């Protein structure tokens, strides 16, 4: 059974080290540590194939802006005939403290425009999410906070659980029950 992991972010160097690109950062970090193959495609996304313990899956970095990510996701789901319940979306969450992680089996968009667009394009909210906390300083306008490059200390803070994030991604690809993953990783402080 093939799975897809989608890291949300915005294309372009100016967004590279911003809170809103945490999904891209998590995917890139995972790819550095695992053998993979880039798949040429016409879906407006970077598509990578990975095999872990005989489980073949795809990792996706949509190359449209965050608010249009759903178009890329829908095209890839249709092309590879992958069910919505077999995707995991990695995204930033302003409601979680920096670096904290939370798995959700489904839900609304909570104001996150990338999630909103995936829900609209796929016509469902029944897909799994790995939320990575980026906190939020309410003294700064939200767009500015999410799209301003962070410093090295902030990056370390955000990625403090990167090993756990990699474990979750690996176990998801290998078909470990999502309920088991939530029970194991949602308790991490």
Swiss-Prot record:
Q: Which residues form a coiled coil?
A: none
Taxonomy, superkingdom: Bacteria
Indicate the residues that form the catalytic site: 20 (proton acceptor)
Q: Which PROSITE patterns match?
A: PEPT_TRNA_HYDROL_2
What's the main place this protein lives? cytoplasm
Pfam families, A to Z? Pept_tRNA_hydro (PF01195)
- Annotated residues for binding of tRNA: 15, 65, 67, 113
Which GO molecular function entries does the Swiss-Prot or TrEMBL record give? Answer: peptidyl-tRNA hydrolase activity; tRNA binding
Q: Does the keyword Transport apply?
A: no
Q: Which UniProt keywords apply?
A: Cytoplasm, Hydrolase, RNA-binding, tRNA-binding
Q: Summarize subunit and interaction data from the UniProt record for this chain.
A: Monomer.
| Protein family | Belongs to the PTH family.
Role played: Hydrolyzes ribosome-free peptidyl-tRNAs (with 1 or more amino acids incorporated), which drop off the ribosome during protein synthesis, or as a result of ribosome stalling. Catalyzes the release of premature peptidyl moieties from peptidyl-tRNA molecules trapped in stalled 50S ribosomal subunits, and thus maintains levels of free tRNAs and 50S ribosomes.
HAMAP family with a match to the protein in the record: Pept_tRNA_hydro_bact
What's the protein called, per UniProt? Answer: Peptidyl-tRNA hydrolase
Organism of derivation: Phytoplasma australiense
């Amino acid at each position: 059974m093939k799975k897809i992991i989608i890291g949300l972010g915005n294309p372009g160097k100016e967004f590279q080290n911003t809170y809103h690109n945490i999904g891209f950062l998590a995917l890139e970090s995972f790819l550095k540590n695992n053998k993979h193959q880039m798949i040429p495609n016409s879906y407006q996304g970077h598509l990578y194939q990975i095999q872990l313990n005989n489980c073949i899956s795809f990792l996706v970095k949509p190359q449209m802006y965050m608010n249009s990510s759903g178009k890329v996701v829908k095209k890839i789901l249709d092309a590879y005939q992958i069910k919505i319940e077999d995707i995991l979306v990695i995204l930033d969450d302003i409601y979680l403290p920096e670096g904290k992680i939370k798995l959700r089996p489904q839900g609304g968009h909570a104001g996150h425009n990338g999630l909103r667009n995936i829900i609209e394009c796929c016509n469902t909210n029944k897909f799994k999410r790995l939320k990575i906390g980026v906190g939020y300083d309410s003294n700064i306008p939200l767009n500015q906070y999410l799209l301003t490059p962070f410093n090295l200390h902030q990056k370390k803070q955000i990625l403090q659980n990167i090993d756990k994030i990699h474990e979750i991604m690996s176990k998801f690809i290998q078909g470990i029950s999502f309920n088991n993953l939530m029970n194991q990783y949602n308790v991490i402080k």
